[in-house]
Amino acid sequence: MKESINILAIESSCDETSAAVVVNGREVLSNIIASQISTHEKFGGVVPEVASRKHIEVISAVVQEALDEANFTLDDIDAIGVTYGPGLVGALLVGLQYAKGLAFATGKPLIGVNHIEGHISANFIEYKDLKPPFMCLVVSGGHTFIVYMKDYGEFEVLGETRDDAAGEAFDKVARAIGLGYPGGPKIDKISKEGNEEAIKFPRANFHNDTLDFSFSGIKSAVLNYLNKKEMKGEEINKADVAASFQKSVVDVLVDNTIKACMSKKVDKIAVAGGVASNSCLRETLVRECKKKGIEVLIPPFILCTDNAAMIGSAAYFEYIKGRSTSLDINAVPNLKLGER
């Protein structure tokens, strides 16, 4: 096998169009991201049809910019990695069809990547010496998982949400208290001005035999609190509501992830996904894990949000195992982690 394996990666599962060139799964030569946040902000959330159209408008330019920044041509690329699920089906299809076209035209192998696996693999970019096994908390707008990474590309899901994802709950609560979209960063910011002990919102605790999450109850409790305040004509302290809600979500995420670590006897927790940028989650996880002698690994913001570099990393580890994907592959919007 060549000393350097160059992956061109494409990500378009939601509202970011991204392309990257990644070498040997850990070195990023380029990572171009065209965000649609300003487009969807006025709608209060991502509009799938609008997202798909925006991907179509920019994907060619984004891929070319990724190659140019890396000073590569397609001849220098060994394989093309692309997200094929989970995500918005129309958005996924834009990136997938573009990648399939490149693979067909160049004869390069196509490697379909699970978006969640990509988030986990972002840690290999930031932490060059990281090797399995380790625990990973994946928290984003659409997904919440506790994953035990046994080996490269081998996962065991120990806990997942039974309803709303953590990031989804953040967005809905932010909308309810008038903060707008995207909710996660706005709740994080205003919470710094609030008292996290001001309001006691519930924590979803299941039986001891599961590490699953439920955030719909917390979300409903916040909405009920707001409705009661409004009906009584009482003033609502948005900062206190945001801080108290945030703490209730973070406490459950941290507690379950530490329990998972203890059950598998691992001493490393990697964090992935957009909600990993939340300052309360970072601080609480580091503080509580320190008490247990567990190391916490958190990538920088650019690798927490949706990006193609993480897809390139995951694709590399598939490539060296000799795995590639048929050009008949289709988008799988509800793809499960570990499915092929």
Curated annotation (Swiss-Prot):
Keywords: Acyltransferase, Cytoplasm, Iron, Metal-binding, Transferase, tRNA processing. Fe cation binds at H115, H119, D306. One of its GO terms (cellular component) is cytoplasm. Substrate binds at V138, V139, S140, G141, G142, D171, G184, D188, N278. It catalyses: L-threonylcarbamoyladenylate + adenosine(37) in tRNA = N(6)-L-threonylcarbamoyladenosine(37) in tRNA + AMP + H(+). The keyword Protease does not apply. Its main location: cytoplasm. It comes from the Bacteria. Its EC number is 2.3.1.234. Its cofactor is Fe(2+). The keyword Membrane does not apply. Binds 1 Fe(2+) ion per subunit. InterPro entries: ATPase_NBD, Gcp-like_dom, KAE1/TsaD, TsaD. It is found in: Cytoplasm. One of its GO terms (biological process) is tRNA threonylcarbamoyladenosine modification. Pfam families: TsaD (PF00814). PANTHER family: TRNA N6-ADENOSINE THREONYLCARBAMOYLTRANSFERASE (PTHR11735), TRNA N6-ADENOSINE THREONYLCARBAMOYLTRANSFERASE, MITOCHONDRIAL (PTHR11735:SF6). Belongs to the KAE1 / TsaD family. Required for the formation of a threonylcarbamoyl group on adenosine at position 37 (t(6)A37) in tRNAs that read codons beginning with adenine. Is involved in the transfer of the threonylcarbamoyl moiety of threonylcarbamoyl-AMP (TC-AMP) to the N6 group of A37, together with TsaE and TsaB. TsaD likely plays a direct catalytic role in this reaction. HAMAP family: TsaD (MF_01445). This is tRNA N6-adenosine threonylcarbamoyltransferase.
